[in-house]
From Swiss-Prot:
Note on domains (UniProt): Contains two cysteine rich domains (CRD), referred to as the N- and C-terminal CRD's, n-CRD and c-CRD, respectively. A nuclear export signal is embedded in the c-CRD, with which the nuclear export proteins interact only in the absence of disulfide bonds (or otherwise oxidized cysteines) within the c-CRD or between the c-CRD and the n-CRD.
Keywords for the protein's UniProt record, in alphabetical order: Cytoplasm, Disulfide bond, DNA-binding, Nucleus, Oxidation, Transcription, Transcription regulation
Residue spans of biased composition, Polar residues class: 300-309, 363-380, 401-416
CDD domains noted in UniProt: bZIP_YAP (cd14688)
Motif (Bipartite nuclear localization signal): 35-42, 68-75
Gene coding for it: yap1
This protein's name: AP-1-like transcription factor yap1
PROSITE patterns: BZIP (PS50217), BZIP_BASIC (PS00036)
InterPro entries xref list: AP-1-like, bZIP, bZIP_sf, TF_PAP1, Yap1_redox_dom_sf
UniProt source species: Aspergillus oryzae (strain ATCC 42149 / RIB 40) (Yellow koji mold)
Biased composition (Low complexity): 52-67, 336-362
Ranges for region Basic motif: 159-180
C-alpha cells in the first residue's frame, strides 16, 4: 500500500510543456492569480480533505520520477509496467472549481478579457468608493446620533423667534414714532419760518415806505433851504392853490399873517381916537410913541371904545366936543386924497389891486427903494392929489363913502371922528371880542410839515410885519441883525440819524420791555391781555438807529395800568 501511494504521488505531475503553459497563464494574469491563490488558500484551509488537484501552485513540487537527477527518471515513466492508473477510478473528475483559470487562454481572446478585467477593476473601485461613502455617512450618523433621550428643542426655538419678532416690531414702532415726531417738528419749524419771513417782508416794506417818506421830506427841506427868499413858499406843493385874489400880476407870495398881526391899525380906529383925545395939535411927530403909530395894536386900543363909551350924536354929525387940537391922522389924509381923485378913472378893483401889490413889497424882497414904501407914499399923496395910491382898504371905503355923500353934506365930517371899526363888534359882544383868539388858526399846510417849520420861516426870512413900526419907520435907521446859518444847522441835524431831542438813556428797547414783562407775576399767571398791551406799546413806539424803542415813562404808565 505504501508503494502505491508513492507511485500515485509520483505520477501526478505536469510535463514541461504543461508547466510552460501554466507559467505563461500565471504571468499574463497575475492579479487575478493572486486573488485565485487567496481563494485556493481559503478553500484549502476550509476543506483539508480535498484532492491533490486542489493544491495551490505555490506548493507545487516536482515528482521524483520527473526529476532527471534521480536514476530511472529519464522519461515520463509511463510504461506499461509503471502506469499509475492500474487501480484508477475512471469516474474521477479532474475539473475542480477554478481550474479554467490555471491554463492560459488563447491569444485572440486576451484583449477582450483584459478590457473586461479593466471594467471589472473600475467597477470594483467604484463599488469600493460607494461602500466607503456609505460607511462614512453611517459613521457620521452614528457620531451625531448619540445614545440616550434627545432634548426637546422645538419650544425654545419658537420662543426665541417670538421674542425676535416682538423686538423687531417694537423697533419698527419706535422708528415710525420718531419719524412722525421729526416730521411734526419740521412742519412746525417750516410754519414758524414762513411766519417769520412774512413778518420780515411786512417790516421790510414798512421800512422802505418810511425811507421813501424820509427822502421826500428831505427833498422838500432841501428845496426850502436852497431856494431863494422870494420863491421859498413855492416849494410847497399846495402853495399854488393858495394864491390870493388880486395877486395874479405879482410873483411874490407869502404866508398869510395871523389875525392879531394884521397891518393897518387904522382899521380898528382905536389908536386914532385915543390920540385925538390925548395929543395937542402942535405935538411931535407920530413916531414918538407906539400909540400914535398906525399899525400898532394893543389890547387897550381894541377895547378903547368900551372905556370911552359910544360916540355922541354930535360927534357923529361932525361937531367935536373936545376942544383940544388933533393930529391929522393918516385916515383923514387918505380920505382927502381919495376925495380929490374921485374924478379919475381909477376903479376900486384896480386900486385895491395896486394897494395889495404895494403892501406886499417889503424890505429886502422888493427892487424898489425904501422911499417908495407905503409909509412914504402916504406923505406923497397929500401933495400929489392925482395919484391913484390906496395903501389900505379904508381908502376904498372912504372913496365909496365920499361918492355916496350928498353935496349938502360938508367934507369935514370925515375929518372929525373916524368910524368905530371893530370897536362896534366888541361892544355888541359885551367887550368879550378878542382877535388874538383867531391867531391860533393855521393853514392846512402845517399838518404836512412839522411843528418846528412855523418858526423856521420866521428865522430864515425875518420879514417885518406889514404896518409894524420897524417896517414903516425904522427900516433905514436900524441895521438888520446877523442871520443864523440855518442851512448848516439843518445839515447837522440831517447827519445825526437818531431820534431828535430824545435821551437815549430814557428809551427802552423791545428786549428790555420783554424782560420787565416776564418779571411780572400776572404775566406768568396769564392774567394780562398781551394783545392790548402790545397795541398800546406799538402806539408809543419810535424808530431809532438801534431799532424800535419806547420811552421809559410811557412804558411805566402802561405797566402801571396793567398792574
Amino acid at each position: 500500500m505504501a508503494d502505491y501511494n508513492t507511485l500515485y504521488h509520483q505520477g501526478l505531475y505536469l510535463s514541461p510543456d504543461q508547466q510552460d503553459l501554466l507559467l505563461a497563464a500565471l504571468s499574463s494574469n497575475q492579479p487575478p492569480q493572486k486573488q485565485q491563490n487567496d481563494k485556493q488558500r481559503s478553500q484549502a484551509k476550509t476543506d483539508p480533505d480535498s484532492t491533490p488537484g486542489n493544491m495551490s501552485s505555490g506548493s507545487f513540487s516536482m515528482s521524483p520520477g520527473f526529476n532527471k537527477t534521480h536514476p530511472g527518471s529519464g522519461g515520463l515513466g509511463y510504461g506499461d509496467d509503471e502506469s499509475p492508473f492500474l487501480d484508477f477510478n475512471p469516474e474521477l473528475d479532474f475539473d475542480f472549481p477554478g481550474s479554467e483559470n490555471l491554463i492560459g487562454d488563447l491569444p485572440g481572446s486576451l484583449p477582450s478579457e483584459e478590457h473586461e478585467v479593466g471594467e471589472k477593476r473600475k467597477d470594483m473601485s467604484d463599488n469600493e468608493n460607494e461602500e466607503s461613502g456609505k460607511k462614512r455617512r453611517e459613521s457620521d450618523d452614528k457620531a451625531a446620533k448619540k445614545p440616550g433621550r434627545k432634548p426637546l428643542t422645538s419650544e425654545p426655538t419658537s420662543k426665541r423667534k417670538a421674542q425676535n419678532r416682538a423686538a423687531q416690531r417694537a423697533f419698527r414702532e419706535r422708528k415710525e414714532k420718531h419719524l412722525k415726531d421729526l416730521e411734526t417738528k419740521v412742519d412746525e419749524l417750516q410754519k414758524a419760518s414762513d411766519d417769520a419771513n412774512q413778518e420780515n417782508g411786512l417790516l421790510r416794506a414798512q421800512v422802505e415806505r418810511l425811507q421813501v417818506e424820509l427822502r421826500e421830506y428831505r427833498k422838500r427841506l432841501s428845496w426850502l433851504t436852497t431856494g431863494s427868499g422870494i420863491s421859498a413858499m413855492s416849494a410847497i406843493p399846495s402853495a399854488h392853490s393858495r394864491n390870493l385874489y388880486g395877486l395874479n400880476n405879482n410873483d411874490f407870495m407869502f404866508d398869510f399873517p395871523k389875525f392879531g398881526d394884521l397891518p393897518g391899525g387904522h382899521i380898528f380906529n382905536g389908536p386914532l381916537t385915543k390920540s385925538n383925545q390925548n395929543k395937542p395939535r402942535d405935538g411931535s411927530s407920530p413916531a414918538t410913541s407906539d400909540s400914535q403909530v398906525p399899525g400898532v395894536m394893543t389890547r387897550e386900543t381894541l377895547n378903547g371904545s368900551n372905556n370911552r363909551g359910544m360916540p355922541t350924536a354930535k360927534a357923529a354929525n361932525g361937531v367935536s366936543n373936545n376942544p383940544s387940537p388933533k393930529v391929522p391922522s393918516v385916515y383923514n389924509i387918505r380920505q382927502s386924497a381919495s376925495s380929490h381923485d374921485s374924478s379919475n378913472s381909477c376903479s376900486p378893483s384896480s386900486s385895491s389891486d395896486s394897494h395889495q401889490s404895494q403892501m406886499l413889497s417889503s424890505n429886502g424882497t422888493s427892487p424898489e427903494p425904501s422911499s417908495n414904501s407905503p409909509a412914504t407914499k402916504l406923505n406923497d399923496s397929500v401933495q400929489n392929489h392925482h395919484a391913484c395910491t390906496y395903501s389900505t382898504i379904508d381908502a376904498v371905503r372912504g372913496k365909496s363913502e365920499s361918492v355916496s355923500n350928498t353935496p349938502s353934506q360938508p367934507n369935514n365930517n370925515y375929518e372929525q371922528t373916524p368910524g368905530p371899526g371893530l370897536d362896534l363888534l366888541a361892544q355888541q359882544n359885551g367887550g368879550q371880542f378878542d382877535p388874538v383868539l383867531f391867531g391860533d388858526w393855521r393853514e392846512p399846510q402845517d399838518a404836512i410839515l412839522s411843528q418846528d417849520f412855523g418858526t423856521f420861516f420866521d428865522d430864515a426870512f425875518p420879514l417885518p410885519d406889514l404896518g409894524s413900526p420897524s417896517h414903516n419907520f425904522n427900516e433905514v435907521a436900524n441895521p438888520q441883525p446877523p442871520k443864523k446859518d440855518l442851512i448848516a444847522e439843518i445839515d447837522n441835524k440831517l447827519d445825526e440819524e437818531v431820534v431828535p431831542g430824545e435821551d437815549k438813556s430814557q428809551m427802552l428797547s423791545c428786549t428790555k420791555i420783554w424782560d420787565r414783562l416776564q418779571s411780572m407775576e400776572k404775566f406768568r399767571n396769564g392774567e394780562i391781555d398781551v394783545d392790548n398791551l402790545c397795541s398800546e406799546l406799538r402806539t408809543k413806539a419810535r424808530c431809532s438807529e438801534g431799532g424800535v424803542v419806547v420811552n421809559q415813562k410811557d412804558v411805566e404808565d402802561i405797566m402801571g395800568r396793567v398792574k
